[in-house]
Amino acid sequence: MARIAGIDLPRDKRIVIGLTYIYGIGNTTAEKVLAEAGVSEDVRVRDLSPEDEDKVRAAVDKLNLTLEGDLRREVSLNIKGLQEIASYRGIRHRRGLPVRGQHTKNNARTRKGPARAIAGKKK
């Protein structure tokens, strides 16, 4: 099992998909990493040679990406900063409501959580 940036990549997937299991690497970045490393996107993780693994690790380091714990910390600090300055976005985060302008009259159940029954309200 290949271990890159502290994450075990799934053995049965193609390397381009396996890299997306690392927080902070999506499809486009995974393709850039593999192009930098000179490794084919179609190779399965289990078929990677140790040299190819080292090339991919070096390419991830060379691209100077913020990944995993550092990226999660950065995002949470950004949200915390928005809350501290009491911006509109920070208030929406604090209240657990949609941040990006979605309507909340009918939907937004993902952000608001399960519906709560209101006493005395009938159809």
Curated annotation (Swiss-Prot):
Keywords: Ribonucleoprotein, Ribosomal protein, RNA-binding, rRNA-binding, tRNA-binding. Part of the 30S ribosomal subunit. Forms a loose heterodimer with protein S19. Forms two bridges to the 50S subunit in the 70S ribosome. Signal peptide: none annotated. InterPro entries: Rbsml_uS13_C, Ribosomal_uS13, Ribosomal_uS13-like_H2TH, Ribosomal_uS13_bac-type, Ribosomal_uS13_CS. Located at the top of the head of the 30S subunit, it contacts several helices of the 16S rRNA. In the 70S ribosome it contacts the 23S rRNA (bridge B1a) and protein L5 of the 50S subunit (bridge B1b), connecting the 2 subunits; these bridges are implicated in subunit movement. Contacts the tRNAs in the A and P-sites. Pfam families: Ribosomal_S13. This is Small ribosomal subunit protein uS13. One of its GO terms (molecular function) is structural constituent of ribosome. Disulfide bonds: none annotated. GO terms for biological process: translation. GO terms for cellular component: cytosol; small ribosomal subunit. Belongs to the universal ribosomal protein uS13 family. Residues 94-123 are annotated as: Disordered. It comes from the Bacteria.
